[in-house]
Design a protein with these regions (language model features):
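A common structural junction motif
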Residues: 78-89
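Short S/T/G/P-rich N-terminal loop/turn motif that feeds into the first structured element of a domain
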Residues: 1-57, 63-75, 94-113
Length: 113
């Protein structure tokens, strides 16, 4: 089987946008690279991050390696290594992209074979 793609709709819990953006602002290039490598090692890749405003919402497109289920991805994105960064600041609604409707063409080049 092939990897799966998810669109994630992130929206902030009350009063959490400021603290979340504060943590994001502290992440330098080295920290971001380390985080991306950690995600790859556990089978996830963030293809794009699309915030609409500082108060949200935000959208992302993620890829999950074959073997990681939809439930696994929800646990990851809600957990300390996911978008919440350990703060429980976001509600994360995941939507699996139906690649059967695209003729099997993924929205991005696959990172996982």
């Amino acid at each position: 089987m092939a990897s799966k793609f998810f669109i994630v709709h992130h929206h902030f819990k009350p009063g959490m946008s400021g603290p979340w953006w504060g943590v994001m602002a502290e992440a330098d290039e080295a920290a971001q690279s380390a985080q991306a490598e950690k995600w790859m090692n556990i089978g996830y890749f963030n293809h794009c991050f699309m915030p609409l405003s500082q108060e949200g919402p935000m959208y992302c497109v993620w890829e999950a390696k074959d073997g990681n289920s939809e439930a696994d991805f929800q646990d990851f994105i809600d957990g300390p290594d996911g978008a919440n960064m350990g703060m429980k600041s976001l509600n994360n609604n995941i939507m699996k992209v139906n690649l059967e409707l695209t003729g099997g063409v993924p929205p991005y080049e696959r990172k996982f074979a």
